[in-house]
Amino acid sequence: MTARHPKLPHVYLKPGEFHFATKPTVVTTVLGSCVSVTMFDVFSRTAAICHALLPDGPRDDVFRYVDSSIIRMLEMFMSRGITPRQLQVKLFGGSDMLGATASRPGVGSRNVDIARQVLAAEGLEVAAADVGGTRGRKLFFYTHTGEVLLKRLNRTEADS
Protein backbone atom coordinates (compact mmCIF):
# COMPACT_ATOMS: atom_id res chain seq x y z
CA MET A 1 0.00 0.00 0.00
CA THR A 2 2.92 2.39 0.49
CA ALA A 3 4.06 2.00 -3.12
CA ARG A 4 2.10 5.17 -3.94
CA HIS A 5 4.87 7.19 -2.28
CA PRO A 6 7.94 4.92 -2.20
CA LYS A 7 10.39 7.80 -1.72
CA LEU A 8 8.73 9.27 1.37
CA PRO A 9 10.18 8.50 4.80
CA HIS A 10 8.22 5.85 6.69
CA VAL A 11 7.58 5.72 10.43
CA TYR A 12 6.05 2.81 12.33
CA LEU A 13 3.98 4.07 15.27
CA LYS A 14 3.95 1.79 18.32
CA PRO A 15 1.33 1.80 21.09
CA GLY A 16 1.72 4.82 23.34
CA GLU A 17 3.54 6.85 20.68
CA PHE A 18 2.66 9.82 18.49
CA HIS A 19 4.12 11.51 15.44
CA PHE A 20 3.96 15.22 14.65
CA ALA A 21 4.98 16.06 11.09
CA THR A 22 5.79 19.20 9.17
CA LYS A 23 7.36 17.23 6.30
CA PRO A 24 5.81 14.50 4.14
CA THR A 25 5.94 11.12 5.86
CA VAL A 26 3.99 7.88 5.75
CA VAL A 27 3.08 6.79 9.27
CA THR A 28 1.96 3.19 9.68
CA THR A 29 0.36 1.64 12.74
CA VAL A 30 -1.68 -1.43 13.66
CA LEU A 31 -4.72 -1.06 15.92
CA GLY A 32 -6.86 -3.48 17.88
CA SER A 33 -8.64 -1.97 20.88
CA CYS A 34 -6.31 1.04 20.72
CA VAL A 35 -7.34 4.16 18.85
CA SER A 36 -5.54 6.53 16.54
CA VAL A 37 -6.63 10.10 16.07
CA THR A 38 -5.22 11.95 13.08
CA MET A 39 -5.17 15.73 12.78
CA PHE A 40 -4.24 17.61 9.64
CA ASP A 41 -4.05 21.30 8.75
CA VAL A 42 -4.48 21.74 5.00
CA PHE A 43 -2.94 25.24 4.96
CA SER A 44 0.38 24.46 6.66
CA ARG A 45 0.44 20.75 5.73
CA THR A 46 1.12 19.98 9.38
CA ALA A 47 -0.13 16.66 10.73
CA ALA A 48 -0.21 14.51 13.85
CA ILE A 49 -1.25 10.99 14.77
CA CYS A 50 -1.38 9.16 18.09
CA HIS A 51 -1.72 5.48 19.03
CA ALA A 52 -3.44 5.50 22.44
CA LEU A 53 -4.00 2.34 24.49
CA LEU A 54 -6.46 3.31 27.23
CA PRO A 55 -9.29 5.84 27.63
CA ASP A 56 -7.76 7.89 30.44
CA GLY A 57 -5.23 7.70 33.21
CA PRO A 58 -2.38 9.46 34.97
CA ARG A 59 -0.58 12.16 33.04
CA ASP A 60 2.87 10.56 33.41
CA ASP A 61 2.74 8.92 29.97
CA VAL A 62 0.53 11.26 27.94
CA PHE A 63 0.29 9.29 24.71
CA ARG A 64 -0.80 6.02 26.35
CA TYR A 65 -4.19 7.62 27.05
CA VAL A 66 -6.82 8.82 24.59
CA ASP A 67 -7.90 11.92 26.50
CA SER A 68 -4.44 13.34 27.15
CA SER A 69 -3.21 12.40 23.65
CA ILE A 70 -5.89 14.52 22.01
CA ILE A 71 -5.28 17.49 24.31
CA ARG A 72 -1.50 17.34 23.82
CA MET A 73 -1.84 17.10 20.03
CA LEU A 74 -4.09 20.17 20.03
CA GLU A 75 -1.58 22.07 22.18
CA MET A 76 1.15 21.28 19.66
CA PHE A 77 -0.91 22.69 16.79
CA MET A 78 -1.95 25.77 18.78
CA SER A 79 1.68 26.46 19.73
CA ARG A 80 2.28 26.87 15.99
CA GLY A 81 -0.67 29.23 15.55
CA ILE A 82 -2.97 26.56 14.11
CA THR A 83 -6.47 26.78 15.56
CA PRO A 84 -8.62 23.71 16.25
CA ARG A 85 -11.19 24.76 13.64
CA GLN A 86 -8.48 24.53 10.94
CA LEU A 87 -7.94 20.85 11.66
CA GLN A 88 -9.33 17.88 9.80
CA VAL A 89 -9.77 15.11 12.40
CA LYS A 90 -10.16 11.38 11.80
CA LEU A 91 -10.67 8.53 14.27
CA PHE A 92 -9.76 4.85 13.90
CA GLY A 93 -9.61 1.63 15.91
CA GLY A 94 -11.40 0.75 19.11
CA SER A 95 -12.18 -2.87 18.28
CA ASP A 96 -13.69 -4.98 21.04
CA MET A 97 -11.75 -8.12 20.37
CA LEU A 98 -12.07 -9.84 23.74
CA GLY A 99 -15.76 -10.53 24.22
CA ALA A 100 -17.23 -7.24 25.38
CA THR A 101 -20.95 -7.18 26.15
CA ALA A 102 -23.63 -4.50 26.11
CA SER A 103 -23.59 -4.35 29.91
CA ARG A 104 -19.78 -4.37 30.07
CA PRO A 105 -18.22 -2.54 27.12
CA GLY A 106 -14.67 -3.42 26.22
CA VAL A 107 -11.68 -1.11 26.30
CA GLY A 108 -12.06 -0.49 22.55
CA SER A 109 -15.57 0.92 22.95
CA ARG A 110 -14.46 3.01 25.92
CA ASN A 111 -11.51 4.36 23.92
CA VAL A 112 -13.81 5.47 21.10
CA ASP A 113 -16.33 7.01 23.52
CA ILE A 114 -13.66 9.05 25.30
CA ALA A 115 -12.14 10.16 21.99
CA ARG A 116 -15.52 11.39 20.73
CA GLN A 117 -16.25 13.15 24.06
CA VAL A 118 -12.90 14.97 24.18
CA LEU A 119 -13.03 15.94 20.51
CA ALA A 120 -16.59 17.30 20.94
CA ALA A 121 -15.61 19.18 24.11
CA GLU A 122 -12.79 20.84 22.13
CA GLY A 123 -15.21 21.77 19.33
CA LEU A 124 -13.72 19.33 16.83
CA GLU A 125 -15.82 17.41 14.35
CA VAL A 126 -14.74 13.99 13.15
CA ALA A 127 -14.45 14.16 9.35
CA ALA A 128 -14.05 10.39 8.97
CA ALA A 129 -14.04 7.39 11.26
CA ASP A 130 -13.67 3.64 11.13
CA VAL A 131 -14.17 2.33 14.66
CA GLY A 132 -15.51 -0.61 16.63
CA GLY A 133 -16.16 -4.11 15.45
CA THR A 134 -14.03 -7.13 16.23
CA ARG A 135 -11.21 -6.78 13.70
CA GLY A 136 -7.95 -4.91 13.87
CA ARG A 137 -6.86 -2.28 11.40
CA LYS A 138 -3.62 -1.30 9.73
CA LEU A 139 -3.37 2.40 8.91
CA PHE A 140 -1.20 4.29 6.47
CA PHE A 141 -1.32 8.03 7.28
CA TYR A 142 0.07 10.39 4.65
CA THR A 143 1.08 13.46 6.63
CA HIS A 144 1.32 15.79 3.62
CA THR A 145 -2.28 15.18 2.49
CA GLY A 146 -4.10 13.99 5.62
CA GLU A 147 -5.17 10.89 3.71
CA VAL A 148 -5.52 7.61 5.61
CA LEU A 149 -5.55 4.25 3.89
CA LEU A 150 -6.97 1.45 5.99
CA LYS A 151 -6.69 -2.32 5.79
CA ARG A 152 -8.92 -4.49 7.97
CA LEU A 153 -7.08 -7.38 9.56
CA ASN A 154 -8.00 -10.84 10.69
CA ARG A 155 -8.14 -11.11 14.47
CA THR A 156 -4.73 -12.79 14.64
CA GLU A 157 -3.00 -9.93 12.77
CA ALA A 158 -3.86 -7.08 15.18
CA ASP A 159 -1.33 -6.66 17.96
CA SER A 160 -2.88 -4.08 20.27
UniProtKB/Swiss-Prot annotation:
This is Probable chemoreceptor glutamine deamidase CheD 2. The lineage of its organism: Bacteria, Pseudomonadati, Thermodesulfobacteriota, Desulfuromonadia, Geobacterales. It is an enzyme of class 3 (hydrolase). Its EC number is 3.5.1.44. GO terms for biological process: chemotaxis. Keywords: Chemotaxis, Hydrolase. The keyword Phosphoprotein does not apply. One of its GO terms (molecular function) is protein-glutamine glutaminase activity. It catalyses: L-glutaminyl-[protein] + H2O = L-glutamyl-[protein] + NH4(+). Probably deamidates glutamine residues to glutamate on methyl-accepting chemotaxis receptors (MCPs), playing an important role in chemotaxis. The gene is cheD2. It comes from the Bacteria. HAMAP family: CheD. InterPro entries: CheD-like_sf (IPR038592), Chemorcpt_Glu_NH3ase_CheD (IPR005659), Cytotoxic_necrot_fac-like_cat (IPR011324). Belongs to the CheD family. Coiled coil: none annotated. CDD domains: CheD.
